[in-house]
Regions:
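Hydrophobic residues within beta-strands of alpha/beta enzymes
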Residues: 31-32, 63-65, 104, 149, ...
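Histidine-acidic metal/acid-base catalytic patches
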Residues: 1-8, 12-27, 90, 100-102, ...
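Metal-dependent catalytic neighborhoods of phosphoester/phosphodiester hydrolases
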Residues: 42-48, 77, 82, 261-262
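Active-site acidic/histidine proton-transfer and metal-coordination neighborhood
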Residues: 15-18, 57, 74-181, 235
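Active-site-proximal loop/turn and secondary-structure-junction residues that shape catalytic pockets
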Residues: 10-12, 35-37, 68-71, 110-112, ...
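Glycine-rich, proline-tolerant flexible connector loops at the mouths of alpha/beta enzymes
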Residues: 33-56, 111-114
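The substrate-binding groove and active-site-proximal loops of carbohydrate-active enzymes
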Residues: 37, 75-83, 187, 228
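Catalytic-core regions built around general acid/base machinery
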Residues: 47-59, 134-141, 199, 236-240
């Protein structure tokens, strides 16, 4: 079974339809739609119908969407901000359902660069409470539309909560597995200096998605390299995913091309790697 997918995030210099063309040409059966980067508002009516036709014409399955990030998060530090973004996330849950996706990726907390008074010592507590309120609002909506929200580990060097699988696992255990899971971003693990094997084990059976890319440093921007172009041990990674009986998609999210390499060539390189790595 070919359980691979490729993120449109890998095509920053292309429209969403051009990204779909390249993903299809590279041989992937499924795609993760980057919302915010490629679709900034949920499509409706004729635009929605046309987009579904574009997916079908390329024989691509929209396996997941990535909700807008940046300001759009569960753990906003003011109630006005939180309500606004929870409403945005609800609208994208509906969009995910409308295009036949099963999962939506969410950043649980904001990047400190977006947080007013980012060093406020009360921020961790404020964020924890905000995340809970947002999830209490969104879980019934996700259930209604048949979408699972997957919370992503994040590469922020700060004292905010919910940046690792270890922390996120404790959070998602409080909610139904059909509506809330985890997505492991491998590059973010590397940026944070965490151990990929331990993060996978911490996620365990609540791991429902992956963002697969390599990393060669501990700063934002050191990740999103092609597989085996950084420091991650991909054999150990796959072995551990098999040990926890991971059955979700293998979604590749490389963005950084090498010199004179196009975005489509990076997707093809990654596809070649995936076929060997996963024995497709």
């Amino acid at each position: 079974m070919d359980n691979t997918s490729y993120s449109t995030a890998g095509f920053r210099n292309k429209s969403v339809l051009e990204a779909l063309d390249s993903i299809q040409k590279s041989g992937y059966p499924s795609v993760e739609i980057g919302c915010g980067s490629h679709i900034d508002q949920p499509l409706k009516n004729a635009d929605l119908n046309n987009f579904n036709k574009e997916l079908k014409s390329r024989n691509l399955k929209a396996r997941s969407i990535h909700a807008p990030s940046g300001l759009t998060t569960l753990g906003a530090t003011t109630e006005e901000w939180r309500i606004k973004e929870a409403t945005t996330l609800a609208s994208f849950i509906i969009f995910a359902s409308d295009i036949g996706a099963s999962d939506m990726v969410i950043h649980p907390i904001p990047n400190p660069i977006f947080v007013p008074d980012a060093d406020n010592p009360n921020n961790p507590s404020i964020m924890e409470k905000a995340v809970a309120r947002s999830l209490d609002y969104l879980i019934p909506i996700a259930e209604k539309y048949g979408i699972r929200m997957n919370l992503e580990n994040l590469p922020y060097h700060c004292n905010y909560p919910y940046r690792s699988m270890k922390e996120l696992r404790l959070l998602v255990e409080q909610y139904p597995a059909d509506q809330l899971g985890l997505i492991l971003d491998t590059g973010h693990v590397g940026v944070m200096g965490d151990e990929i094997v331990e993060e996978i084990k911490s996620a365990g059976d609540r791991l429902k998605g992956t963002h697969l890319h390599d990393v060669n440093g501990n700063q934002d921007g050191d990740d999103h390299k092609g597989p085996n172009r950084g420091i991650l041990n991909w054999d150990d990674m796959l072995k551990t995913l098999k040990e926890i009986q991971y059955s979700g998609p293998y979604t590749f999210e490389p963005i950084v091309t090498q010199e004179n390499e196009t975005e489509e060539e990076l997707a093809i390189f990654t596809r070649t790697f995936a076929k060997t790595w996963l024995s497709i």
